[in-house]
Amino acid sequence: DWSSDVCSSDLELLTWWMTEENFHQVIDHFLVMRICLEPQACLLAATVGTAEQKAHLNTLMAEMAALKENFRRERWIEVDMAWHEHIYEMSANPFLTSFASLFHSVYHTYFTSITSDTVIKLDLHQAIVDAIIQSDGDAAFKACQALLRSPDK
């Protein structure tokens, strides 16, 4: 079992441990953790996020939408990661923010693996932004669950 070999003090090592053989297992574990934490981060972003933070989230979402018309794969991955990390920052919870930082490279590996030649789940990302901007924590929580539970491709 690869998980017993991972040093808990340096979770960034996960990307080093990730091999072609265990990639899907690592990602499955990562997605379980995301489904536990990310909807709560969205709820908090909606309820405690500042107007300035919400405006920045809207700017990131606008860039994601623009990439639908003029897709650039590397830029999509950067903006999608920034979008998710910004929501964690908006939660104002240092543990949630630390999660996003700790797993930055795992997020990058995951987003790189699922991104091909088009934007991904734009409408589901927009539903989260709409709920956060409207300060509707419950809707943000549910919209995030919908995003994380829908198929990647």
What are these regions (language model features)?
Residues 58-61, 65, 70, 78-79, ...:
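C-terminal all-alpha effector/ligand-binding and dimerization domain
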Residues 1-8:
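Short, small-residue-biased leader/transition segments that mark boundaries at the very start
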Residues 50-57, 90, 133-136:
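A short, structured loop/turn motif at beta-sheet edges
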Residues 9-13, 18-23, 33-49, 62-65, ...:
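Hydrophobic, amphipathic alpha-helical faces that serve as interaction scaffolds
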